[in-house]
């Protein structure tokens, strides 16, 4: 006998396949623009979409919310990723399958370098791979690097808008409290030593998605920054 839950899952998968929908983000080819903004928090999608012309809610499934509209006549979308590398990499892989090819990660981070003040913009050029998702794609020797075209565009925009900004390396982690309360962790010595090393190396900020997004972008040959 097959459990009822298995039958239900199979029926959902078949329905998505028949409609051409991606399994997690629930969008299909034509639903999204080539350019996608990727916040972590689903609630931020509606706020971002308010800047679009003719914005429409396309999908709302799990942590993945997608709106599509237009900016200066160009079709663009916003899709949330949830927290961390696993869910972010799923969103990116499925958005690429749906036809998108240029992505901007937007969200909050924790400042590390003393020059990074609250409210400053941090443009990540690359990420320290302290998370586990990218290890499923390639050995640790391969770097997680943002696309240069996207980085340059973000820096140019920050300059034009007069924002205080910093461009450089960020730390990407899996455990929020492992970094913010390291002394409570069984491996506190390792976490603290690495944190101090990153500071000495000029790491700008700490967050939880960039490494996975940069890495999957490199693998899929799309632009991510």
What do the PLM-derived regions correspond to, one by one?
Residues 194-225:
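A C-terminal functional module that forms or caps the active site or interfaces directly
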Residues 41, 170, 217:
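A residue-level signal for conserved active-site and pocket-lining positions in enzyme catalytic cores
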Residues 110, 171-177, 212, 220:
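Glycine-rich beta-alpha junction loops
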Residues 145-200:
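Active-site rim beta-loop-alpha module in soluble metabolic enzymes
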Residues 50-57, 126, 155-164, 175, ...:
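Generic secondary-structure signature for well-ordered alpha-helical cores
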Residues 9-153:
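Metabolite-binding pocket within alpha/beta catalytic cores that recognizes anionic/polar moieties
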